[in-house]
Curated annotation (Swiss-Prot):
Record function comment: Probable multifunctional globin with a hexacoordinated heme iron required for the catalysis of various reactions depending on redox condition of the cell as well as oxygen availability. Has a nitric oxide dioxygenase (NOD) activity and is most probably involved in cell-mediated and oxygen-dependent nitric oxide consumption. Under normoxic conditions functions as a nitric oxide dioxygenase (NOD) but under hypoxic conditions the globin may switch its function to that of a nitrite (NO2) reductase (NiR), generating nitric oxide.
Record's protein name: Cytoglobin-1
Pfam families registered for this protein in UniProt: Globin (PF00042)
InterPro entries named among the record's database cross-references: Globin, Globin-like_sf, Globin/Proto, Globin_lamprey/hagfish
Family the entry assigns: Belongs to the globin family.
Example of a GO biological process term: response to cadmium ion
Protein species of origin: Danio rerio
Tissues where this protein is expressed: Expressed in all tissues examined with highest levels in brain, eye, gut and heart.
Domain Globin: 15-165
Keywords: Cytoplasm, Heme, Iron, Metal-binding, Nucleus, Oxidoreductase
Enzyme Commission designation: 1.14.12.-, 1.7.-.-, 1.11.1.-, 1.15.1.1
Catalytic reactions on record: Fe(II)-heme b-[protein] + nitric oxide + O2 = Fe(III)-heme b-[protein] + nitrate; Fe(III)-heme b-[protein] + nitric oxide + H2O = Fe(II)-heme b-[protein] + nitrite + 2 H(+); 2 superoxide + 2 H(+) = H2O2 + O2; H2O2 + AH2 = A + 2 H2O
Length: 174
């Protein structure tokens, strides 16, 4: 998987099957056990490959060297936040109301407070998938695992775009 990891905008929230949910939750356990390292790996890859994303992060906007990024306390903290948010999604895949609340809070925060362009959710989703496949090959090598995770990332991106549209993102970024 490279680039956007096959993440599609058209993934609707109900596109995960029960099998997808089980696959995602089972393969997530070893990742979350290594969340500190995984979160840093995701953000270092994200900012190295897409340096324009750093514009939204004043605490590590100037970092260029991946080794320096790995040691940055604020980057580590944000990596934990990303993985914790993903963990909350994974834990609640069968609770549509809870997921809707999570997506609304995350989307509104990033649209209104942080003013993050929603395209970065698609980019970050692809980076997450790439890092998971590379760092956890025993779990993420099978095509069906990658397909299930790609659906989840597509749902995340779809939902963020939905929330951004609801809050009038086009008007708020001008």
């Amino acid at each position: 998987m490279e680039g956007d990891g096959g993440v599609q905008l058209t993934q609707s929230p109900d596109s995960l099957t029960e099998e997808d949910v089980c696959v995602i939750q089972d393969t997530w356990k070893p990742v979350y056990a290594e969340r500190d390292n995984a979160g840093v790996a995701v953000l270092v890859r994200f900012f190295t490959n897409f340096p324009s994303a750093k514009q939204y992060f004043e605490h590590f906007r100037e970092l260029q060297d991946p080794a320096e990024m790995q040691q940055n306390a604020q980057l580590k903290e944000h990596g934990q936040r990303v993985l914790n948010a993903l963990n909350t999604l994974v834990e609640n895949l069968r609770d549509a109301d809870k997921l809707n609340t999570i997506f609304n809070q995350m989307g509104k925060s990033h649209a209104l407070r942080h003013k993050v362009d929603p395209v970065y959710f698609k980019i970050l989703a692809g980076v997450i998938l790439e890092v998971l496949v590379e760092a956890f090959p025993q779990c993420f090598s099978p095509a069906e695992v990658q397909s299930s995770w790609s659906k989840l990332m597509g749902i995340l991106y779809w939902q963020m775009n939905r929330v951004y549209a609801e809050v009038g993102w086009e008007n708020s970024k001008k």
